[in-house]
From Swiss-Prot:
The keyword Lipoprotein does not apply. Pathway: Amino-acid biosynthesis; L-lysine biosynthesis via DAP pathway; DL-2,6-diaminopimelate from LL-2,6-diaminopimelate: step 1/1. This is Diaminopimelate epimerase. SUPFAM superfamilies: Diaminopimelate epimerase-like. The gene is dapF. It catalyses: (2S,6S)-2,6-diaminopimelate = meso-2,6-diaminopimelate. Catalyzes the stereoinversion of LL-2,6-diaminopimelate (L,L-DAP) to meso-diaminopimelate (meso-DAP), a precursor of L-lysine and an essential component of the bacterial peptidoglycan. It is found in: Cytoplasm. The keyword Cytoplasm applies. It comes from Pectobacterium carotovorum subsp. carotovorum (strain PC1). The record marks H159, E208 as: Could be important to modulate the pK values of the two catalytic cysteine residues. Keywords: Amino-acid biosynthesis, Cytoplasm, Isomerase, Lysine biosynthesis. Its main location: cytoplasm.
């Protein structure tokens, strides 16, 4: 099986063309491939499939390193767009794809950055999903001896965003796994720790469900900005600084889609016998 290794700001992927290759990935195989000592090693596996709808270009599937399938990965979406162009699967600059939960348009810019229409953030608890009596801008959550205030949003996948004074000292490794699998998130969640520098700049670390802390999380950056704007902390255009680099997020508020712009890097092509 041929594959490519790619990354978006250090969030790394194994990308596989299932348009011209017949492939099947069991959870066990994915875990074996994800092993950084005995396999290829990656945060997520991205699979390019033929479109289910003739109006679209491709179907986009995402699997975490633990073998679970998820509906959204923003950094992966940028790599997906570069991959299909690099491999000659399309020469379009605006690429329409379906995901497990919806549709996206991926736009490759002249300088090879990728701008992704992530759709409109959804704050309705049942759509996240998140167990709450009603929608609020902030929720109180308790996990073991910890009590935190957070915002909750879906970017096609569930996110919990906590504002912190300093991301460098945030309790990512302690609170991350506790909140990721909290009973109020029936499908688990990605946990973002956001430091607001000013209305145009945030620093962010994300503990991703099924992957742990990663160098960057595109949908997590989108979620953090959406929550920050909802809470009146941020403007419509925000630079998000993650451990792996920066993303630019634009959201004009309710009724509008959110856009993420950032790089996608091809590292190498490989072949593996399954």
């Amino acid at each position: 099986m041929q594959f490519a290794k790619m990354h978006g700001l250090g969030n790394d992927f194994m990308v596989v063309d299932a348009v011209t290759q017949n492939v099947y990935f069991s959870p066990e195989l994915i875990r074996r491939l994800a092993d950084r000592h005995c396999g290829v090693g990656f945060d997520q596996l991205l699979v390019v499939e033929p479109p289910y709808d003739p109006e679209l270009d491709f179907h986009y599937r995402i699997f975490n390193a633990d073998g679970s399938e998820v509906a959204q990965c923003g950094n992966g979406a940028r790599c997906f767009a570069r991959f299909v162009r690099l491999k000659g699967l399309t020469n379009k600059r605006d690429i329409a794809v379906s995901t497990q939960t919806g549709r996206m348009v991926l736009s490759v810019t002249d300088d090879e950055l990728v701008r992704v229409n992530m759709g409109e953030p959804n704050f309705e608890p049942q759509q996240v999903p998140f167990r709450a009596v009603k929608a609020e801008k902030t929720y109180i959550m308790r996990a073991d001896e910890h009590t935190v205030l957070c915002g909750v949003v879906s970017m096609g996948n569930p996110h919990c965003v906590i504002q912190v004074e300093d991301v460098d000292t945030a309790k990512v490794e302690t609170l991350g796994p506790l909140l990721e699998s909290h009973e109020r998130f029936p499908e688990r969640a990605n946990i973002g720790f956001m430091q607001v520098v000013d209305s145009h700049t945030v620093r962010l670390r994300v503990y991703e469900r099924g992957a742990g802390e990663t160098q960057a999380c595109g949908s997590g950056a989108c979620a953090a900005v959406a929550v920050g704007i909802q809470q009146g902390l941020l403007s419509a255009n925000v630079r998000v600084s993650l451990p792996g680099g920066d993303l630019d997020i634009q959201w004009d508020g309710p009724g509008h889609p959110l856009f993420m712009t950032g790089p996608a890097t091809h590292v190498y092509d490989g072949f593996i016998h399954l």
